[in-house]
Amino acid sequence: MGILSVIRIFIYCLIRLFSFNSRKRNSSIDELERGEINAFACDKQNTPSPNSECRPLTPLNSPFRRTVEGDTANLQAPSPTACPSFDSASSIKSSKEDIACRKLSTERFFYSPNGIDEMKKQQQFKKIPTVSITEVEPAFIPSNMEQALFSEEPFVIQDDLSHQINLDDNRKFSRIQKNKLDPLITVNLVPIVNGENCFNFYETQMETNFLSPEFIKKPSMVDHKRDSEINAVTAVSADGSFSPLTETLSSTISTLSNDSLDGLSSQKNEFTGFNSNSEWIPNDTVDYICNSDASSVVSNLSDFEDCFDQFGVYDKEYEKKIEKTKRNFPKFQSSATYPPFSAHHQARRNNPQGFRNVKKRFQLFKDDCTALTDSDFLDALPFFNARVIIALYVEWRLRVYETMIIKGEESLKNLQRARDGPHNKLWLGVFGNKDTIKKLSNYDRRAISNPYVSNHLNFNVRRVKSDTVYIPTILQLLRSSTQLMTEQAFVASSNLKSTKGLRETRLIQKYKVKGDFEYVYAALYYAAFTQESTLKAVTIDDILSEDELEDWWYLNLRYTSFITPQLCFEFLDKEADSCRDRLTEVKSEPPKAVIYEEPLNKLSRFSSDRLFTSHELVAIAELISLNEPPLESGKKFYYEEFQKACQKKRDDYRYSPEIEFKAAFREKFLQSNEKVPFPRPGEIYEKRCDYFSKYACQNIFISKPLKRSGSIYEVFSDGIGRVIYGSVLDYEATRNNILLHFGFEIHCAPSEEELIEREEAFKDFHNMLSFKYSANEIYEFCGTHSRAEVHKNEVLKRMAYYLIDENKEISILRRILSLRIVEPTTSFTRYEYDLWRTFYPDVLYLNYSKSGRIPTGSPYIMNGQWRKDLCVSTPPMVDINSALFPHWFKLSASNLFAGAEHAGLNRQKPDKIDLDLYEPLPENSYLVAAELRVLRALRHKNPENIPLLEKWEVRALHQLMAKIRKYYTVPTDYLSLRMDGLQAMLRKREYMSCYTFNYFDYACLMDHAYRLYEGFNNQVVNLPPRIM
């Protein structure tokens, strides 16, 4: 029995010993993962209980204390997560969710090939910077921390530092005694002076007393000596400079210089912890700096509702101005340097419900950042400083960009898992066919928009045919891109001298629009500029229209296209300072009148032959012919009237002889009745003796004889032309007469030798339209990609239709319409084209719209442009029979592809073309509208495919929306709503420079594109454009 009892006691001691060690080890590991202790320093001392009731609440012992992350932490936590509650008063009690939230923020995304071991290794060498002592007002400074502030080695925060502070030491360094501290104050906070906590203040019952003088007056300066001592050891943030929200709003100190940090610290000390009666107030709004997350560009968004008004800090440098001019203090009180604008307070009081709605929307910032829209930031302008909204907007774009990256990676993993599964219904349910499975398993490299992936892929093994290309799987792409990003991040961390976050340096290039106009970004910058230059609050109504705002943006491009907003703030500070000087200092001298030259009056220096087009010359002759000139001096009369028209054009560039002729004709012959339709030009020329003077009918407008001999084609063309279009004039003789009367030289027709040379140049032209093509010519049309064979069939089919169409009646009517102009044909010269365009520009325009090709004479034929146009007219699933489709098609293509760069690349031989740089697609082999290509591709894509869009495709869809609104009238509200929905979806992703869509967004995008494509072809294209 004695032996058994000894064994039991021994086992019991072992159990107690192991359980104690494991419990201690688990708690240490948990604290280490939460970032609350260091891996090396775990100095446990005899400290008071953490739950001591008499211990004053300071930011160091706050349950929501978070250390500032360093370089490695930025790599580990590239995206901030949900943070503690918005109510600063409720942030006193901790919860398991908050601890798990902080744990998740450090473990969310850790790009490391070695996993947890690498994480622990980096955790040991992680540099934890010091806490800003000036922000911790009554805290005790330990001796080792005091030494570390003046040494070069990094200071290490010991474990449970907040619990090691003695109550006596804390009372010694504090300005308040224990008996003066009311426990109710720590729960129900009094609003701090100058609106530092006014975000929560408006939900209290003290709204009427906030703007009273006792809250507005300047706080007293207490103990300047101690303030200067503490300011001398101010700890700087991780990147060497403050974030936009924590910077001072001074107009004289640069927001980029480190010199402004001392002023910010001293100004912060003036407002932190004391009211006007020099009594200490527990300010838990100071906690937002200590609780900052270095993985965020805006480092204090944990309690961002306080940061809105904390951004405007009292500026010491304005004390001298106030003392010199007491009368300017009310104006200074409402300026941009005084926190915050009185107009913002007034807007919150006048519209409390709108202020609550904005506040409620911004609460989604941390919970679900994708639920916010760009309009929310514009709605917040009446209530907050525009600079703060810019900083929040930049942070929002960055957060949503990272969120979309995460969703894109998850969708790629799910897609690869579905492709590898045995029940593979994703790829059309094909089983057993090895060739088909091999083709479908190839990953389309054109869908890769990740620069790390595209740089990492080895394209040297690529061959001419796409079926034999080596393309890695999606998991290999993810693995390689992750490793490459990790390697580049480590290289960047070693090269950076400062402790700026890797997340900011790596991603800030992506979400910033470098010079490109973006409406919300430009509107916020314009609001900040207006707010600080006029010293007034800005609302949405004060922002310019989109066209005017775009002009303002590019006019100030050197200020608005920087990488970070601080550079623009520096410019705004200078402008605000100069505007304040102009407002406060009254100058006795009157301003000088600046006379600007009219930029649109360039026609005043033009000669007479450059003022009007050929069609306008005909209109001037018709206008003069309405009145009978003297028979003896007919040419002199026409010349003098023409010089008067030239003077009108020089005086007013908007002068149009066509409009003036129609008005004079309607007044003389139609009794100014607007309801009577205006006669066609052919009708006027047929009855010209009834309308024009006798002199004009005899000496200017010459009739051509009726054609009675020749081929049946020529006779039939002349008759139809007279009946339908009134082509009864001898156009060549009429134009020459007009030029002679106006003092110009006549245009000579081409000689027989020139016509013979031209015919010889095109003797084999029609033979080129046959089906016999060499391999190089087919490659020139279609390229070498996998869809080249399909597109080649479409091109040849269209050529067959073109040959058949020439034998139809419509071909004869086109020839009659345009004086044998049907493109391309050998019976057409530039002389005939210019002659017809002189009298019938609208008819020629309609003919050009129907044909879709440009009849510009020999260069059009010699350069092979007709073949390019023939390929342009063969995009699949496009209504090429609509009347105005080619006109819109040309507008689209000219804006996207200026010149023939893409076509020039396509004209190379297959053995010389560099497929790594350019692989032609059938839709953009020549100057094809990229908008139609994207819409067409979205219409036929399966939503299960990889949802990636290239950047130029998103911009092309934006241009499509703009062109439809600019050139056409959208008839139905349904189509307009579709356009708005598509544009809003694209704009949200283009602002973030992120074009990765999840399944739901991609299906919605495809539905928008399909409906818009159908509605555009059925309703919009067939309407006349506005430019007509």
From Swiss-Prot:
Gene Ontology biological process terms from the UniProt entry: ascospore-type prospore membrane formation
Primary localization class, coarse: membrane
Gene Ontology annotations for the cellular component aspect, listed alphabetically: prospore membrane; prospore membrane leading edge
Lineage top rank: taxon: Eukaryota
Topology within the bilayer: Peripheral membrane protein
Subcellular location, record wording: Prospore membrane
Coiled coil spans: none
Keyword annotations of the record: Membrane, Sporulation
UniProt function note: Has a role in spore morphogenesis. Involved in the assembly of the forespore membrane.
Protein name per UniProt: Sporulation-specific protein 3
Phylogenetic placement of the source organism: Eukaryota, Fungi, Dikarya, Ascomycota, Taphrinomycotina
